[in-house]
Amino acid sequence: KSTDGGKTWRHLGLHDTRHISRIVINPKERKTIYVGALGHAYGPNRQRGVCMSQDGGQSWKKVLYTDERHGVADMDINPENPNIVFAALWRFERKPWTFISGDEQGGLYRSIDGGLNWLKVTAGLPKLVGRMAVKVSHSNPSVVYVMTEAKDGTLYRSDDSGVTFRRVSKEVEIVSRGFYYTDLRVDPQDENRVYAVSSRLWLSIDGGKTFKRISKQTHVDYHALWIDPRDTSRIWQGQDGGIAVSYDRARTWDYINNFTVAQFYQIYADNREPFYYVGGGLQDNGTWSGPSRNREPFGIMNDDWRMISFGDGFHIVVNPDDPELFLSESQGGNVVRTNMRTREQQVVSPQPRRADGDPVSELKYRFNWNTPIVSSPHDSQT
């Protein structure tokens, strides 16, 4: 918790929740806080579910918990009647070669007494659900949306404050790779203007019945969207390519490129002189290389950095005899050899085709999402 605008922070407990999906604050009683905890991603644990504090985070009480395998994927609260609180429970476990996402024990839970007691909402919602997003309309809190991974549909709407729901969309694209994205936003001033946050960004202006893709000029894989409640034409988005802002209600977008938000998986350094080069693999932004310094009066510029290969950049190996020859690796054990002088590339993966999306049983070799590659310190050809 920060009380000085983010300059300093104080730990408030719940250390074993490991992954927290959402923090919700009662708009009429600011000391009442709800924490939606997903819990451990790789195994069961008991510190998951909904925890509530009534003293600004000094102490916590677990108010919604079903078992050690179901955690909270999302939460929201009715802005006019904050006694109505929603929590979406989800079973998710990562395994060495697969994962578990969803079951019939998960689903949407609703409280009408400020989180003290909860009931599972079943009217109109599918039984078998994966990750869920739940959002209450601020312009009309009787309207509640739920987006989920499910065979029966993807978007559901309630017009009675979440007592019952009806399916409004079966569009699967709005929950593309649902276990990884699945988020939802409702325009604070228009209950029928709905944004689906997924691998692509989607907009509905008819209450979720139809969607169209927007923001085609920005990077894909969206993880965050914020709509200014005072001026809904101003919208901020966060995706694997960085941060962008719209000032015209999502018609056009401007990238905010004056600060660094890149995430390196792995870095390297070579032995060239007089200045060695550094580089590495970036999350969903390829593999890059650039000088550690130069003799130019303005120092290192963006143009000094060169992209070696595409995809989710992970490990990189430089030839010790020729610093312009690289082996770079992207998701699923895909390895590319690149000559930066000629810009020639050749796929040299042990597996001749991409592993993305293929059943594990059909693959000759199996590779982690992030598969290390190393070169021999004794033989430059190995």
What is each stretch, according to the model?
Residues 1-382:
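Beta-propeller blade termini and top-face loops
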